[in-house]
């Protein structure tokens, strides 16, 4: 019996599922928002939220745990230097899933996964770029 087993298999082997979630975590950290199917989005939320909680406290041990799960130095750096401090005061609920209709080919329910807060990006005004071109 499979009582108390809440894992979605997503029609994949365990190694494929692990690699897919790892890639989705890296993409979400890099782009801050991704488009995927609703079941994948719900599974992604289950694995990315503990990673952000881990990043709130920047220690060598936590960085090693994050690298063990992400396997990407750039993602770990952004996680601890940008996202961790951004969500320091928030006690959970770092991601949002927005349902966005159905995919054209197979009618699969699609969703948009994004962080609740986005990091501030320094905007370049048009005047400064025009001055730089001169």
Curated annotation (Swiss-Prot):
Q: Report the superkingdom from the record.
A: Bacteria
Keyword tRNA processing on entry: no
GO MF assignments: structural constituent of ribosome
Q: Which GO terms describe its biological process?
A: translation
A Pfam family that this protein carries is Ribosomal_L17
Q: Name one GO cellular component term.
A: cytosolic large ribosomal subunit
Going by the UniProt record, its keywords in alphabetical order are: Ribonucleoprotein, Ribosomal protein
- Quaternary structure annotation from Swiss-Prot or TrEMBL: Part of the 50S ribosomal subunit. Contacts protein L32.
PANTHER family per the UniProt record, alphabetical: LARGE RIBOSOMAL SUBUNIT PROTEIN BL17M, RIBOSOMAL PROTEIN L17
Please give the family membership noted in the entry.
Belongs to the bacterial ribosomal protein bL17 family.
Q: Which HAMAP family match?
A: Ribosomal_bL17 (MF_01368)
Identify this protein by name: Large ribosomal subunit protein bL17
Annotated organism of origin: Paracidovorax citrulli (strain AAC00-1) (Acidovorax citrulli)
Instruction: Kindly list the organism's lineage.
Output: Bacteria, Pseudomonadati, Pseudomonadota, Betaproteobacteria, Burkholderiales
């Amino acid at each position: 019996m499979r009582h108390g087993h809440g894992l979605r298999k997503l029609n994949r082997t365990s190694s494929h599922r692990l690699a897919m979630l790892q890639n989705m975590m890296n993409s979400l950290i890099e782009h801050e928002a991704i488009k995927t199917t609703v079941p994948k989005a719900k599974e992604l939320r289950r694995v990315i939220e503990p990673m952000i909680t881990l990043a709130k406290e920047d220690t060598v041990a936590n960085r090693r745990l994050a690298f063990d799960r992400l396997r990407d130095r750039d993602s770990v750096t952004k996680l601890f230097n940008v996202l961790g401090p951004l969500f320091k005061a928030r006690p959970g609920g770092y991601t949002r899933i927005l349902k966005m209709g159905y995919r054209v080919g197979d009618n699969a329910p699609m969703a948009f996964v994004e962080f609740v807060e986005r990091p501030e990006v320094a905007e370049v005004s048009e005047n400064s770029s025009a001055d730089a071109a001169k």
